[in-house]
Structures are given as structure tokens and as C-alpha cells.
Amino acid sequence: MTGAETIHIFHLVRHDGSAIFLHPFRGDQNTLDLLENPQIEGLYGAEPQVASLTGFRNELYSLAESALRAWDSQMRFLPRFVLSAALFVVSFLFLSIVVRDPVPVLDELLISLAVSIAAYVALRARGRGSERVERKRITLRSRIDTIVFSESSVVQLLEEGLHMHEAEQDAIDALLAERGDPFAEAEGPIVDEVLQYLSLRFPDRGFRRQERRLLRAERGAAEQVRHWASQQSIDLPLFCFYLRLKRTVGSRKVHR
């Protein structure tokens, strides 16, 4: 998402009453750009508990801090590296020329390397406490504090679809069952955004492989996926919910 397009954060209440937040923030430098977007809005189906919102806000603080560290490391990497390299050279020459007692070359290298690494770490720690970084930290935290959640009928429909997969004895059976579309009335860019954020939770090839097995109805696919999910501690109901939503959205695009 670019420009001033609204970024949504989705709060879904699960069948057991716990909460899940879907959002694009991952603690990388892109998070800084997203948090600086003037339009960030939270949407919920069932009303969230204060404790859930507080916990999520603290999570965003942590992600913003990680993003800020990545940003500072990239912005100041070159000058810190050059200064550390210069200290390495100076230390090596000092040990080689100035120190009277001969020091083995290997020891000179190790000592000089330790000095340069210590200098780099100290410079990085100092930079994270700089006025520039602190100003950006305050801006990000203030931005997080201004995010407001409002009720959404679309998110309510999505919650119902998630509950369908959680309430069944087996989430895979709920996915494969030929039933009415639980997302029939959930359309538009909000659903696409939810799907995008869910895909961030299931990003690697392992998930793609299991997805193909299920959607192609391969022999023994359901049992293989159950075993895989158990071994990898996968949130199977959420994964099946994601696949069902992905299949629904893809089908609509094909028939347009």
C-alpha cells in the first residue's frame, strides 16, 4: 500500500474468546513507512477487550522499536564501519610499531579486531539514544496511540467464517465440506487486505505445498496435512480459514 491509502488493523475474536490481530507491521524498515501513514484505522467484529488492545499496543511499540533499530543501523552503518575500520588500523599500527615488547602478529590482529568491534557496538548504542532517534521514537509511539478501532460488519462475517473452522471437530473437514460460502457477503478491498495479512502468517514453501495438497484433493492429503500441522505446531483452524477465504476471493476474480 502506498500514498495516503488507509491501512487497516483487524481484530478478530476467536471461538474460545481469545483475540487475533491482523496487520502489516513486521518490525522491519517498511514498518516505519506504514506507521507514518496518516490514515491507520482499526476494525473489529465483536467488541475487543481493553486488555487485548493494551497488549496489542505494546506489541506495536516493540515492532516499532525493532524497525527503528533497523533504520538507524542502515542509516549510520557506513560512518560507523569506516570509523571502526580506522580504529582497527590505528590499533594494529600501534601494537606493531609503538609497543616495545614484540607482540605476535596474530595477537595484534585479534586485539585490533576486538577494539574495532567494541567501537562499532558502542557507536551503535550511542546512536540509538541520539536525539534524532528519540524524536522518531516519540513520533512513532504517538502515532500508535492515536489508532482508533471501530465496528465493521465485514469483520463480523469474517469472524463467523473463522468460528466455523474452529468449532468443527476437524478444521480440514470444514474446509473441504461443500457448504454455503461463509464469506458470500464479505466483499471489497477489506477482504483483500485481510487475505494479504493472513498470507504474511503463512509465507514459506511448506505452507504452499500443503495448500496445493488440500485444494487438489490429493489422496491422503488431509491426513498428511494434519500430521504436518501437529509436527510444526501450526494454527490449523486459522490456516484453513485462510485457504477458504483465498479460494473464495480467487473464485470471484475468475468469474468477474
What residue ranges belong to the model's regions?
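Charged, low-complexity cytosol-facing tails and large interhelical loops of integral membrane proteins
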Residues: 141-256
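Cytosolic juxtamembrane N-terminal segments of multi-pass membrane proteins
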Residues: 1-76
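Long amphipathic alpha-helices with heptad-repeat character
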Residues: 50-78, 126-169, 187, 204
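Intrinsic-disorder/low-complexity coil detector
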Residues: 23, 37, 101-103, 181, ...
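Transmembrane alpha-helical hairpins and terminal membrane-anchor modules
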Residues: 71-147
